[in-house]
């Protein structure tokens, strides 16, 4: 399946606040249904083992949307007795505002509105820099810039979790957006997100071009996911 380069998702344009909120909820439901958050959290937990237990664990979630994954990390850290600081970055001011409200009960989460390609964060400030369902929104040149910024602010791992561009994934996402009675934007954008996603070799090449040559890409066909990780 060829990548749908240049195709535009509705969520990347202006969206009324109520529709935006509904679509972000749909994304979190889809992540729960397909297990995307679990794959990412496993990487955070693995990275945490490399950080002394008495030291603050710092996580950056790039393109963090409504904050579902950030909250999941915070809940895990509380259960594990780990001190954690999570910075959620999203370029949409409306999305960031919704995330702040959704994360209000989590003082360990800070939300900022910024572009992935120009992160307003200092070099080497995070143990894990994570992006889920984000890279497929970007064309290759911008994706490389975003990965370069993620590498700059990471002192540990860079993790990218995105949809697999396969017919199985396309069918799973199409079915999920219908069976779970998702918003019209989600029914449009979900399958298109699959078609816009990068194949494993394409994703690995983006990492290498961004200065992250030691990248490992794992496929999870049943979950419709790819996870790329570099340290």
Tell where the protein language model's regions lie, with residue ranges.
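Conserved Class I S-adenosyl-L-methionine
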Residues: 196, 200-231
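Class I SAM-dependent methyltransferase SAM/SAH-binding core
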Residues: 60-62, 66-118
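A short, conserved alpha-helix within the catalytic core of class I
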Residues: 138-149
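A conserved beta-strand element that flanks and buttresses the S-adenosyl-L-methionine
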Residues: 130
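N-terminal auxiliary segments of SAM/dcSAM-dependent transferases
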Residues: 1-15
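Conserved beta-strand signature within the Rossmann-like core of class I S-adenosyl-L-methionine
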Residues: 154-163
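Class I SAM-dependent methyltransferase Rossmann-like catalytic core
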Residues: 12, 17-43, 47-48
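C-terminal alpha-helical "lid/dimerization" subdomain adjacent to the S-adenosyl-L-methionine
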Residues: 163-210
């Amino acid at each position: 399946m060829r990548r749908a380069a240049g195709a535009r998702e509705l969520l990347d344009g202006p969206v009324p606040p109520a529709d935006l909120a509904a679509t972000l909820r749909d994304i979190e439901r889809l992540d729960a249904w397909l297990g995307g958050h679990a794959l990412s959290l496993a990487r955070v937990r693995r990275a945490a083992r490399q950080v002394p237990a008495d030291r603050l664990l710092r996580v950056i979630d790039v393109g963090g949307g409504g904050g579902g994954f950030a909250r999941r990390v915070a809940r895990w850290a509380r259960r594990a007795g780990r001190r954690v600081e999570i910075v959620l970055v999203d370029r949409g001011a409306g999305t960031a505002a919704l995330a702040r409200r959704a994360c209000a009960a989590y003082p360990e989460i800070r939300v900022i509105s910024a572009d992935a390609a120009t992160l307003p964060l200092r070099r080497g400030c995070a143990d894990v820099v994570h992006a889920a369902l984000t890279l497929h929104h970007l064309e290759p040149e911008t994706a490389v810039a975003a990965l370069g910024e993620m590498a700059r602010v990471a002192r540990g791992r860079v993790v990218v979790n995105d949809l697999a561009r396969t017919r199985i994934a396309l069918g799973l996402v199409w079915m999920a957006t219908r069976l779970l009675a998702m918003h019209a934007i989600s029914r449009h954008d979900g399958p298109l997100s699959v078609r816009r996603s990068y194949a494993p070799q394409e994703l690995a090449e983006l990492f290498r071009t961004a200065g992250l040559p030691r990248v490992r890409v794992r496929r999870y066909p049943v979950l419709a996911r790819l996870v790329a990780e570099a340290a």
